């Protein structure tokens, strides 16, 4: 329902921009508010449609300068970069062009200190992930949902098998406490680093969506020079890495990589779903779910960012 409403509002925004600010084929002049490319019109319409949806508006005419200003501040607080904030501001001002007070105040982006990626908390908030997905196609969206829901590496999306098609590696002792605290889901097998096969749990509704993408016959693709026989029409490996990078930079202005989805999974598990276990027990469960088996590596996803570390 929300996607339909956002599409409707985006279409309305595109018509508004074409009717009032269409500068395609016209000479550019200093101070002109006209938009001179179809791509810019499409992008600003997308931004307007998302803003109106986030503000729960049924019509663009209901947008007020105060609401637009508050939304700008909200985007700043989410971590959007200065360039993207400026684009949002210009887009919303075009919707408000008939208002007497249609000039929005510039919002300054939060300062971002440049530190090595290895020292950063690479986790995305759920809101940031939803925001990133607005700039993705349906295939990339579903792949992103699966990755964060099951804590997968990008290449593991290419190895998903049903439990009657593969089994977890017998060289490891698997805890029966894995997936404790998770809601109902479907277990699958993925192959991770060094060929380790492990069970992962995908939420029931997401698994049902994924099964609609199952291929009639396995298909071989090449990712980073390695062949993968895929059973589902998903985006994985370098293709998902690249798609996630583009969407994250476009919406947030920065990117911690699709691997940050594993940080999100780990911190959600420890902070929200494994609270009935001791820290040591929770770390053991999580290490097996992530396919690491080494506590020092698992802690990299948590300390000092998790509430329990």
Model-derived features: where do they sit?
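N-terminal DNA-binding module of tyrosine recombinases/phage integrases
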Residues: 1-37
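Non-catalytic DNA-binding core/recognition domains of DNA-processing enzymes
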Residues: 29-103
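Short, basic (Lys/Arg/His-rich) helix/loop patches that form interaction surfaces
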Residues: 241-288, 292-296, 307-309
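Conserved tyrosine-mediated DNA breakage-rejoining catalytic core shared by Y-recombinases
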Residues: 160-208
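Basic, Lys/Arg- and aromatic-enriched nucleic-acid-binding interface segment
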Residues: 126-158
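Flexible interdomain linker/hinge and immediately adjacent N-terminus
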Residues: 69, 73, 101-130
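DNA breakage-rejoining catalytic core of tyrosine-based enzymes
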Residues: 79, 114-131, 185, 194-205, ...
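Active-site/catalytic core of tyrosine-dependent DNA strand-transfer enzymes
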Residues: 201-256, 260-261, 265
């Amino acid at each position: 329902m929300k996607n339909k409403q956002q599409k409707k509002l985006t279409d309305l925004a595109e018509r508004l921009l074409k009717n009032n600010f269409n500068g395609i084929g016209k000479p550019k002049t200093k101070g002109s508010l006209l938009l001179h490319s179809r791509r810019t019109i499409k992008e600003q319409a997308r931004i307007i449609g998302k803003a109106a949806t986030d503000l729960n508006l049924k019509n663009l005419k209901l947008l007020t300068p105060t609401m637009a200003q508050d939304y700008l501040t909200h985007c700043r607080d989410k971590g959007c970069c200065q360039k993207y904030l400026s684009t949002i501001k210009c887009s919303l001002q075009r919707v408000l062009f008939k208002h007497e007070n249609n000039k929005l105040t510039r919002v300054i982006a939060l300062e971002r200190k440049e530190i090595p990626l290895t020292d950063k908390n690479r986790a995305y908030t759920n809101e940031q992930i939803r925001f990133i997905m607005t700039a993705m196609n349906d295939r990339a969206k579903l792949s992103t949902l699966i990755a964060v829901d099951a804590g997968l590496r990008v290449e593991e999306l290419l190895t998903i098998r049903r439990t009657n098609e593969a089994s977890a590696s017998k060289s490891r002792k698997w805890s029966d406490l894995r997936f404790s605290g998770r809601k109902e889901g479907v277990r699958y097998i993925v192959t991770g680093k060094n060929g380790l096969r492990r069970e992962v749990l995908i939420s029931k509704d997401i698994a049902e969506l994924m099964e609609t993408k199952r291929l009639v016959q396995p298909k071989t693709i090449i990712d980073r020079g390695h062949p993968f026989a895929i059973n589902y029409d998903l985006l994985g490996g370098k293709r998902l890495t690249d798609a996630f990078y583009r969407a994250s930079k476009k919406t947030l202005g920065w990117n911690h990589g699709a691997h940050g989805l594993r940080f999100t999974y780990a911190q959600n598990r420890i902070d929200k779903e494994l609270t009935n276990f001791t820290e040591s027990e929770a770390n053991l469960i999580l290490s097996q779910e992530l396919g690491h088996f080494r506590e020092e590596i698992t802690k990299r996803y948590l300390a000092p960012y998790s509430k329990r570390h």
